Amino acid sequence: MRLSALILAQALLGLLLAPGASYSQTITDGDTLKLNGVTYRLWGIDAPEAKQDCPDGWPAGHLAATHLQSLISGHPLICERKDTDRFGRTVAICRAGGEDLGALMVRDGYAWAFLRYSADYAGQEALAKREGLGVHRHGCQPAWEWRQRERAKYE
């Protein structure tokens, strides 16, 4: 009887993680997503805020969220918890189709390596800078500086 239950559980898990499986996911911005009711903040990166534009008008925040959505689309999504942030979000390494979303976002120039917390994506950022991709091409202010400036407006 226990073997039957184990086989059934494995079959159900396979269906949940199968490509094209039905699960609820929403992109909040370029480094935050919601999967089946859990909010995940991508580990080791900081993407432009949703309303953040670069000095040349490039809509960095909107494009970062759109890029993250394109990376996820059509792939099974799995998140591995690393920590919880001060807002109660689960900080995690999330993979779509086996690819680390944080690494891809930084490598493609849609986020910065958040060196304050991790050096995991420093190499991807160096490559994006060298190739002048995304935020590096448009002279965007790092998201942590942009947030600080925005908060100061209301103090």
Task: Describe the residue ranges of each PLM region.
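Small beta-barrel nucleic-acid-binding modules, primarily SNase/OB-fold domains
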Residues: R2-I7, G14-E155
